[in-house]
Regions:
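Residues lining hydrophobic/aromatic ligand-binding pockets adjacent to catalytic sites
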Residues: 1-154
Length: 154
């Protein structure tokens, strides 16, 4: 893996001003190494694939590999890392892997909540029912928006 040749990989990335993609995946003995540190000032890129170790290599459908909902505690590690590095780099991106049942959206909502970023948009009732942690973050953001609007009315 390219993470096994760390010095060579970082030299190549630096030569092209390219960011190391911080990948989260199930941890196997041959998994990509992860340190969550930025290697370039301009860009930080984190991608969360999920930790579905049971279906990672053996699955009936390709999407089964990414069928994973992170807990709030698991996401806190990534939110904390993103919060720390966004003060050091130009742009910070945290991507959650797409999954047909909107787990990526639920994970992204919780990350935004942990980062105290705005949570906008409309979410179907079925989504709110299925993902209670995301639903609580969405409802709290809506209450905060309503409070700000109410506070401005003379």
């Amino acid at each position: 893996s390219w993470s096994d040749r760390l010095h060579e990989t970082l030299t190549l990335l630096h030569a092209h001003a390219a960011a190391w993609v911080q990948i989260d995946e199930p941890k196997f003995r041959f998994s990509i190494q992860q340190n969550l540190l930025p290697n370039e000032r301009g860009l930080y890129y984190m991608r969360l694939h999920g930790r579905n170790a049971q279906a990672w290599w053996s699955h009936a459908r390709a999407e089964d590999r990414y069928n994973y909902l992170y807990s709030r505690d698991e996401l806190r590690e990534f939110a904390d890392a993103a919060d720390a590095v966004r003060r050091l780099v130009g742009r910070t991106y945290v991507y959650t892997n797409n999954h047909f049942s909107a787990k990526a959206v639920a994970n992204a909502v919780v990350i935004k909540d942990l980062l105290r970023e705005p949570i906008d948009g409309e979410y179907p009732a079925a989504f709110l029912d299925r993902y209670p942690e995301a639903a609580e973050a969405i409802r709290a953001a809506a209450r905060a928006r309503a409070h700000r609007v109410t506070a401005r009315i003379p």
